[in-house]
């Protein structure tokens, strides 16, 4: 029995979840998201909760049980609260700004980097050294944050680059004379 999959997903007030076969649709104050699950997983609504169960006792069904439950949980949480990833920029002259539908990054290259902001994602720069990526889809928020970080990841000697807010960079000592 899956320790995660056996727990039903509570649906908060203000969120409606529609189950149609293997497709789920959640509507909330932040928008609408849909999810399609594999055939080995059965989904149903019971007492205002989404219950996820394996259809068969095959290995594949058991492997995907908790995964499907977590995807449903993220779907419900996304339309109700949303997800946010914060990035920090360290380095002399390194900065970020939002111009129209682009995120403009100056990261020590000879040119500035223009990153087009995808649909469904909101990017804010409260300070030139902090970037906040938010949206309803957890996977898309994480992917956009990872793409921004990949432009110049943190280096281990001085810590310059783009890093996640709570990320710990293991520092190295420079060469000795």
Curated annotation (Swiss-Prot):
CC annotations in GO: cytosolic large ribosomal subunit
GO biological process: cytoplasmic translation
GO molecular function, one term: rRNA binding
Record-linked InterPro entries: Ribosomal_uL6-like, Ribosomal_uL6-like_a/b-dom_sf, Ribosomal_uL6_a/b-dom, Ribosomal_uL6_bac-type, Ribosomal_uL6_CS
Pfam families for this protein: Ribosomal_L6
Keywords: Ribonucleoprotein, Ribosomal protein, RNA-binding, rRNA-binding
Similarity remark: Belongs to the universal ribosomal protein uL6 family.
Stated role: This protein binds to the 23S rRNA, and is important in its secondary structure. It is located near the subunit interface in the base of the L7/L12 stalk, and near the tRNA binding site of the peptidyltransferase center.
PANTHER family referenced in this protein's UniProt entry, alphabetically: 60S/50S RIBOSOMAL PROTEIN L6/L9, LARGE RIBOSOMAL SUBUNIT PROTEIN UL6M
Subunit: Part of the 50S ribosomal subunit.
Protein name as catalogued: Large ribosomal subunit protein uL6
Species assigned in the record: Rhodospirillum centenum (strain ATCC 51521 / SW)
């Amino acid at each position: 029995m899956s320790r995660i999959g056996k727990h039903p997903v509570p649906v908060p007030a203000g969120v409606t979840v529609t189950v149609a076969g293997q497709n789920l649709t959640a509507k909330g104050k932040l928008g609408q998201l849909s999810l399609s699950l594999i055939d080995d997983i059965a989904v149903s609504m019971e007492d205002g909760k989404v219950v996820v169960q394996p259809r068969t006792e095959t290995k594949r069904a058991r492997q995907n049980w908790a995964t499907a439950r977590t995807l449903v949980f993220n779907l419900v949480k996304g339309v109700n609260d949303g997800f946010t990833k914060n990035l920090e920029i360290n380095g002399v002259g390194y900065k970020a700004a939002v111009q129209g539908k682009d995120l403009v990054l100056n990261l020590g290259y000879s040119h500035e980097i223009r990153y087009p902001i995808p649909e469904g994602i909101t990017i804010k720069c409260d300070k030139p050294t902090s970037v906040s990526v938010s949206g309803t889809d957890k996977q898309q928020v994480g992917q956009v944050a990872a793409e921004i970080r990949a432009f110049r990841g943190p280096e281990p000697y001085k810590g310059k680059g783009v890093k996640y807010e709570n990320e710990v960079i293991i520092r190295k000592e420079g060469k000795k004379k």
